[in-house]
């Protein structure tokens, strides 16, 4: 029985197989020649026509058409009885017969109803479940490039993982089960092709908390969705492991002796922390619950930093902070809604015609509307995901540079924004304060003090983040070097091998 580790991330996902000796990373994105990860975003699209409307909607439209025909029959009858000329009566009689034929021609009425509904339908009005059931899927870089070329042809789900613990109705749950099942089935297919054998089981990483406010209720829902998706994708067995504990199992392979270790995993969507007793002698045991001294987590990830950098570093060049004629500022919600790539209702609202009209009206009551016009361009062309992605690239560049020039020419020719490492620090400070509070919580809940610390996840590559954690918090604690992007998934693969 073959088992793989799956790091299903907020920003990127990864699959690794461990044979007991070495790790094999599964290539997931053919357009990414260097790495083994794949964007977690999914583009669901229609190349030609949109899907037909649901049966209930068609039947309601048919009933409406029948009411209109019935009214026309009544009017024709009135005309017949009021007509004096036999020829005129014959004309009304023919009209009545024709309308009665239309009234009872159900197939023709259904075709007409579908045609009218399709004509009036826009992509944003299609429920997500219907989109999942009828649309085509594009993953990774291919999906993101397709989205950039034809945003009006589909919908980009920027981070499916961010919705798993949220408040969802029945159809929305089924939609995300369908989306994630497609992704997991693709991961399984890639693994089987590259390993040359059937993959039956998986250990999937999970954050300590999937959602910021729904607590254990959100966690239960998220695990249910992931479990159903894995089954639908063809896995016969699936287990879950807290992501910081998975990272601990990877670093445990390098330790010469028993060591109490603090793991700080700062990923794209969440920050997860644990204090754990690691031991080379116990590394092959399946159940390590007694070794976990403390674990905590929260939805505080790199995506929050990206959105914060948009608001602090980019939005001021797009009209944020400008005053209207009445002295009030341009509504700041314009810009938070623009960044809401992980909030489908908010983003759908931002892309609506009414929202664009509201921005246009605001442009008419400010002295210099040129900056706000950039926001309108983003709104009209559905460029939110691209703006947030630009902020992510800026954040990564500022890990090694003091200043950068960020090109935003897809919004406006020659539109560049200067961003410094100092401005990034200011943008990240509120977020970093919350991360530090989470570290304090984990340390206070642990019965033992850590001897070393491992900081992992994409945000661990930022010197701003590491310096902030060591300032008056982790001072003097030796730091274990690790692979920031692969430690979690390699640890998941180690655990998967125990289940195989």
Where are these regions (language model features)?
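Hydrophobic residues embedded in beta-strands of well-ordered beta-sheets
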Residues: 13, 23, 49-50, 271
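Short beta-strand scaffold segments in enzyme catalytic cores
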Residues: 13-17, 40-44, 272-276
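Phosphate-binding glycine-rich/basic clefts of nucleotide- and phosphate-handling proteins
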Residues: 30-31, 35-45, 50-58, 62-101, ...
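Short, hydrophobic alpha-helical segments
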Residues: 496-500
């Amino acid at each position: 029985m073959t088992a793989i580790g799956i790091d299903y991330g907020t920003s990127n996902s990864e699959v690794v197989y461990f044979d007991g000796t070495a790790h094999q990373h599964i290539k997931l994105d053919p357009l990414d020649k260097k790495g083994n990860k794949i964007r977690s975003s999914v583009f669901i699209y229609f190349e030609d026509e949109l899907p037909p409307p649901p049966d209930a909607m068609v039947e309601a439209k048919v009933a409406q058409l029948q009411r209109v025909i019935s009214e026309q029959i009544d009017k024709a009858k009135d005309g017949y009885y009021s007509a004096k000329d036999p020829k005129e009566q014959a004309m009304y009689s023919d009209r009545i017969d024709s309308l009665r034929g239309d009234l009872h021609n159900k197939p023709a009425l259904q075709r007409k109803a579908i045609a009218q509904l399709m004509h009036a339908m826009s992509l944003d009005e299609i429920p997500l479940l219907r989109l999942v059931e009828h649309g085509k899927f594009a993953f990774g870089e291919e999906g993101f490039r397709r989205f950039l070329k034809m945003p009006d042809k589909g919908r980009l789900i920027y981070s499916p993982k961010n919705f798993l613990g949220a408040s969802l109705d029945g159809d929305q749950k089924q939609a995300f089960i369908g989306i994630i099942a497609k992704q997991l089935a693709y991961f399984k297919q890639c693994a089987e092709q590259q390993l040359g054998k059937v993959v039956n089981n998986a250990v999937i990483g999970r954050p300590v908390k999937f959602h910021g406010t729904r607590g254990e209720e959100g966690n239960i829902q998220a695990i249910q969705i992931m479990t159903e998706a894995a089954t639908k994708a063809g896995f016969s067995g699936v287990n879950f492991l807290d992501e910081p504990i998975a990272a601990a199992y990877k670093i445990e392979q390098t330790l010469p002796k028993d060591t109490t270790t603090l793991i700080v995993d700062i990923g794209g969507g969440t920050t997860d922390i644990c204090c754990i007793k690691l031991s080379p002698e116990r590394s092959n045991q399946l159940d390590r619950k007694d070794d976990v001294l403390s674990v905590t987590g929260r939805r505080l990830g790199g995506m929050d930093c990206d959105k914060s950098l948009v608001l602090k570093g980019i939005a001021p060049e797009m009209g944020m902070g400008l005053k209207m004629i009445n002295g009030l500022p341009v509504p700041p919600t314009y810009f938070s809604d623009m960044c809401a790539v992980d909030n489908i209702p908010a983003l759908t609202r931002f892309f609506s015609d009414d929202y664009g009209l509201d921005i246009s009206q605001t442009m008419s009551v400010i002295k210099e509307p040129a900056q706000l016009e950039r926001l309108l361009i983003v709104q009209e062309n559905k460029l939110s995901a691209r703006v947030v992605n630009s902020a992510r690239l800026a954040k990564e560049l500022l890990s090694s540079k003091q200043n950068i020039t960020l090109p935003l020419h897809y919004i406006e020719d020659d539109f560049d924004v200067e961003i410094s490492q100092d401005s990034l620090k200011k943008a990240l400070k509120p977020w970093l304060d919350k991360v530090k509070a989470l570290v304090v919580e984990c340390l206070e809940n642990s019965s033992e003090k850590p001897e070393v610390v491992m900081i992992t996840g994409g945000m661990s590559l930022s010197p701003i983040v590491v310096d902030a954690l060591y300032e008056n918090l982790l001072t003097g604690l030796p730091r274990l070097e690790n692979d920031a992007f692969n430690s979690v998934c390699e640890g998941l693969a180690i655990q998967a091998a125990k289940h195989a």
